[in-house]
Amino acid sequence: VSFSSSYGIQEIIKRPDLLNGEQYRQVHEAARLNYLSDIQAGILPAPTSGSAAGLALKTPMANTGVNTNWLDYVLRTGAITNNQFSFSSGGENSKIYFSVSNISQEGIIKQDKYDVSRVRLNVEQKITNKLKFGVNSYFTYLDSVPIVDDNNTYQPYSNAINAAPNLAPYGEDGKPNRNLTSNNPLWAFERVVSDRYQTIGSNIYAVYNPIKNLTLKSSVSGSIMSRRYNRFDAPNTRRGEQAGKPWGYGYYSTNNNREYLIENTANYNKEFVDGRLVVDVLAGQSFQRWEYEDSYVQGENFPSNDLKWLVSAGTINAGRSYFMAMSLASFFGRAQFTWDNKYNLMVSTRYDGSSKFAKGNKWGNFPAVSAGWTVS
């Protein structure tokens, strides 16, 4: 029996030293004066009257008295816990292994969350001196709240770096301020996101040795993965507004993947000439199938922040469902010869058939020959 548990915290290693509100205004004013100087010197053309550049040129940036460190609104101290438990037992005829684990993490970006639990069970039983059975199975459950717009220039951290420090994070209505020169980093935290995975899989096998040096093995394995992803921009939020009025947007998707593999092999391994020649011959058959299924629906015009599911949407404006399946059947063989642990010769072939290809082109043969010499 084994058990371990740990807890840790996470901080950003090198936090950027950003300008405060007054420093930002001073830099802007210096740039404005340099721009005017270049125009007067004929280096740059004057901007069109009434354009954004023209208005900015005429008007110095106001001293708002606001000093916002946007990173304070985006970052936090992250935390991670890790718990592991395992049990193993067995002897000559039977073996068992069981484990359960959980990793829970809150990232340094606010609302970022990751929680995964795993269970594994391996059992092997020797029936006779020639026959044994085994089962390897597992289950995984993942629940996460991903960073909104992750891997995107508009994700919270990037926006916090770009946002002007002389502007307030919230407006008079208590919502994230929209009067910024870039996206408000706080808009990301208005979105409700849920992403969940479940995976279950197992491998059942039997190994039989009818005579010395000959091993027959049959196995059946499979896995099922399902995912549910949901996001909601509530109507009474900046993200959920339309033309400044409450509206709301929702999106829901599911993914289901199934896979199974059947494999049968016969392996013969024998030494000749007082062990100088080793012959290893393998022949087998396998069949594998994959199935992929996904769908999504999105809608808008929600009556309330509390009604988050698409059944409450006033309009369903998009949707799709998709299914794909493919199979691969194989027959294979391999013969390997080794002399004095120094000279090696291998001959192999595969005869594969795939459902991906058109009728008359589904099957192909793939022979191979290789030779080797072990230097030392």
What is each PLM-predicted segment?
Residues 219, 334-338, 348:
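Exposed, low-structure sequence patches enriched in small/polar residues
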Residues 1-2, 80-82, 95, 103-106:
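A beta-strand signature from Gram-negative outer-membrane beta-barrel systems
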Residues 2-67, 107-114, 118-201, 217-329, ...:
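Surface-exposed loop/interface segments of Gram-negative outer-membrane beta-barrel transport/assembly proteins
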Residues 2, 95-99, 132-134, 215-217, ...:
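Residue-level detector of the transmembrane beta-barrel scaffold of outer-membrane proteins
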Residues 5, 100-106, 345-354:
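Transmembrane beta-strand segments that form the barrel wall of outer-membrane beta-barrel proteins
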Residues 85, 121, 202-204, 264-266, ...:
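Membrane-embedded beta-strands of outer-membrane beta-barrel proteins
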Residues 80, 91-92, 128-130, 209-211, ...:
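Outer-membrane beta-barrel channels and translocator barrels
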Residues 73-77, 87-91:
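Outer-membrane beta-barrel initiation region
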